[in-house]
Amino acid sequence: MPKSIYESIYKDLKQKIERDVFAYQELLPSENTLIQTYHCSRNTLRRAVSRLVSDGYVQTMQGKGVRNIYQPAAQTAFTIGEIESFRESALRNGHQSLTKVLLFTEFAINEKQALYTGFSVGTDIYYIQRLHYLDDMPLILNHNYFLKAAVPGLTPEIAENSIYDYLENTLHMTIVNSKRIMTVEKMTQIDEKYLKLNAEDYNCMAVVSSQTYNSDGVMFEYTQSRHRPDYFRFYDNAVRKSN
């Protein structure tokens, strides 16, 4: 089954749900109708619907159909089970995004950096500090470490636009999975400066540290994302397994 067909059906249905083409609690068109609409096999359609179920967008009901259960988040929300860029998350939630590069440099990983990034000592990387704005408000300060050998030609201009778009559509990299750790850490002076936080109101940050791998099993990125605590939200959809 071609992945591109399944992906295109999944993305189209997801966009229609997000844009209220199918209203909340409304049943989606029947399976046969969707098969005719997308000119696909039953298995291909069911795989796309299964992913929407995993995302928490729809719920299948035996003998009745597929019901839309999607409700948009009040604030921008990243999805725990998916890898998406800041721009993709903003677009999905209906917000305007902007990224500013504060620092773009190159160096080799030292022993201290190797402990928290996962890169080996001596590995050449691009180090980037980026400030992400949502609707003109600074929300996330990113510390990005990208493996130079895996992302040749990376520039500050690309970093201000979309690094993942460059990786996938120019370098044709397949991004497969990301290991994430979420912690609460003390706010630093850099956090306070760039995220416009008042130390009297906030003394902690929500921090997401991630190691991301491509289809060759190579870790090409370590990123520490430092989020404004008043706008931090990660979304997950949990399913109870039957005994």
Map each language-model feature to its residues.
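A generic "binding-loop/recognition-motif" signal
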Residues: K64, F86, I163
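Short, hydrophobic-biased segments on the C-terminal half of alpha helices
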Residues: V49-S50
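Short, cationic-aromatic polyanion-contact patches
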Residues: S4-Y6, S30, R67-G81
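Extreme N-terminal segment that seeds HTH/winged-HTH DNA-binding domains in transcriptional regulators
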Residues: M1-C40
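Extended, compositionally biased flexible segments
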Residues: V53, T60, E84-R87, L91-H95
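C-terminal all-alpha effector/ligand-binding and dimerization domain
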Residues: L98-N243
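Beta-hairpin "wing" of winged helix-turn-helix
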Residues: F22, S54-G63, I69
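Residues in the helix-turn-helix
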Residues: T44
